[in-house]
Amino acid sequence: MFGDEKRYPSKSIAEVANICRGASPRPISDYLTEDVNGVNWIKIGDISIDDIYVTHTAEKITKEGAKKSRYVTPGDFILSNSMSFGRPYILGIEGCVHDGWLIISDYQESLNTLFFYYELRANQVQSQFNALANGTTVENLNTDLVKGVNIIVPSIELQNKFADYAQFCDKFGFV
């Protein structure tokens, strides 16, 4: 990617986005619903490892349960924070997330969504996640750790070009 920090500015994720942790209504079984008007309940099992976007959920929670969780909207990122930590996904749907997710939002002023996705997946960011998570009993990330991760922030024009190229490669199976 754009790895030259001398040529492109480096910023912490906290400088360009808001980060918070998901929350779970407890006990969750009291808030699950089959009502079509329920709120999407986004879980790791709804997403395959190769997915970029979250487009569906298997379960929904009640509106009361949503008040005790974290609401997310299309374009927000969710980042797994334990076990297979550091995997980013772009939301294509509205819903709520539990405390196994970190939410990254309000980044659009500084970052192209697709560029940001590939940057979060890049070795230079993943190695920071790994270093931060090592040493804990169960390897995991939290909001304070992720806030301090540094990313390269080239001009939005270069980010857009990168995103266009990545979409082209993905469309034709080059990625």
Description of each model-found segment:
Residues 14-31, 45-74:
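Sequence-specific dsDNA recognition surfaces
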Residues 39:
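Alpha/beta-hydrolase fold active-site loops
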Residues 23, 85-86, 127:
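Glycine-centered loop/turn positions within well-structured domains
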Residues 13-18, 48-54, 90-94, 102-157:
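Basic, amphipathic alpha-helical recognition segments used for DNA target recognition
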Residues 1-3, 26-31, 88-91:
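Intrinsically disordered, low-complexity boundary segments flanking structured domains
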Residues 1-25, 148-175:
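Non-catalytic DNA-recognition/assembly elements of restriction-modification systems
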